[in-house]
């Protein structure tokens, strides 16, 4: 059992602090911490010459939360794909004390955008974990595509559709098959992919449907 996993990100401090000033008590330590954090983040961007990348501080905080969600999702998928693990605890639903960036909810108990949504998605009863190895692919060397199914419910007959798309939407790889998605952890697909003619960024997408053509 893994007692604690989780990345971190700041809340969207522009809105949080504005609401706290209007509706909360600005004398509380929590408000002072968040106000100081926001001011220090602004100073840091200016001092490092990176302010032009984030003229809107909201976008800076939301991008942090996207990294937070992406990391949480990958860690949860890894743990749930490991047959030697019986469970895990996500740290944390709310941030507080000296761990202000750990929470999936902000000071007002509002979800922290993608940090919350990605963690929630990775905790669904049925998920597929998609891995390409290596993550950064040299065209001449190819890549290995591995898809693992994690099913905490009953077994179900399923239809899988796997596609790899370029940034422009061109489909460069496609495969489909039917199988019984068993309860537990199942290796669903593994194949070496020829990438000789590829260049740029590509995304792997997997659709899983039941016999009633409903997405799972």
Indicate where each model-derived feature is located.
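Short, solvent-exposed loop/turn segments enriched in Ser/Thr/Gly
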Residues: 141-145, 188, 203
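Extended interaction regions within the primary functional domain
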Residues: 47, 124-125, 191-200
């Amino acid at each position: 059992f893994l007692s604690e996993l989780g990345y971190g990100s700041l809340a969207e401090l522009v809105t949080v602090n504005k609401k706290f000033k209007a509706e909360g008590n600005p004398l509380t330590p929590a408000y002072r911490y968040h106000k100081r954090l926001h001011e220090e983040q602004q100073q840091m961007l200016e001092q490092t010459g990176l302010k032009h990348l984030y003229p809107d501080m909201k976008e800076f905080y939301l991008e942090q939360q996207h990294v937070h969600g992406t990391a949480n999702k990958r860690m949860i998928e890894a743990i749930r794909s490991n047959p030697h693990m019986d469970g895990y605890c996500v740290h944390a639903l709310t941030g507080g004390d000296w761990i202000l960036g750990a929470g999936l909810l902000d000071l007002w108990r509002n979800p922290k955008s993608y940090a919350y949504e990605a963690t929630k998605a990775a905790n669904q009863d049925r998920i597929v974990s998609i891995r390409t190895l290596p993550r950064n692919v040299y065209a001449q060397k190819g890549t290995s595509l591995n898809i693992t199914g994690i099913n905490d419910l009953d077994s179900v007959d399923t239809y899988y559709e796997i596609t790899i798309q370029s940034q422009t939407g061109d489909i460069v790889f496609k495969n489909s098959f039917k199988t019984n998605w068993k309860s537990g952890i199942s290796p669903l697909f593994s194949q070496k992919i020829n990438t000789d003619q590829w260049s740029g960024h590509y995304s792997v997408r997997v659709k899983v449907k039941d016999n009633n053509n409903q997405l799972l």
